[in-house]
Amino acid sequence: MKKSFILWMGVVLMMVIGMSSCSSEDNFVTNPNKEEPIVQTDYFYDYDGIKIPLTLNEDKALISVPKGFDMVSERILATVQPFYIVPDTFFDMFFITRADLEKLASMDFWEEDAKSVIITPSYIIDDDRGEFYQQVYLTPYLLVKLKKEEDIDLLTSYIEKYKLQITYHSTYFPLSYTLSVTLDSEKSPLECANEMFESGNFVWSVASKAYPASGAD
């Protein structure tokens, strides 16, 4: 993965350490094979000891197309105009509106193409006091830190359980791993990260979020 992207995700990591969710049953278009989006709003993350809610923004989403599915990406770009595109090594990542997502869903090709994409939601972070407000987008990635190097087998068991993949690991930070959900994953990155963190087996496990360039949305 490109260094700039890793550094960017590292900053995100420091902001959202300790993320937790009230419910893991529903998500918003995490599994593209589902017929309809399912709206679930009661997500939270811990920031400086305060549990801050994540409110689902139903109007925007992020479509991630694994590299190698070039025709899928081309059909998306020929049908809608993403308001921002994330440079990434493993996915073509397109920020789109809900109207664009509905337009894609109306196309004949989408029934098949939807099997080759990962769609993740946008959230509004608001502490209800006006002190912190940010719109963020859930990416396919999650960031995990082991307690000790010998826990790699434990991590592998979770990778197999959630059908994840390792996308980045540096020998300079042997305990830290960047994972991603795959087309076979049945849970969202947020659900996977929360459940891994709540297991108590890891120093941290957080879903990575993206922020479009200023003015992009």
Model-predicted segments: where are they?
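Post-signal peptide N-terminal segment of mature Sec-exported envelope proteins
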Residues: 31-55
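Terminal targeting/pro-maturation regions of precursor/exported proteins
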Residues: 57-59
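Short, aromatic/basic amphipathic alpha-helical patches
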Residues: 73-80, 106-108, 156-161
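Autoinhibitory propeptides
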Residues: 86-149, 157-158, 165-217
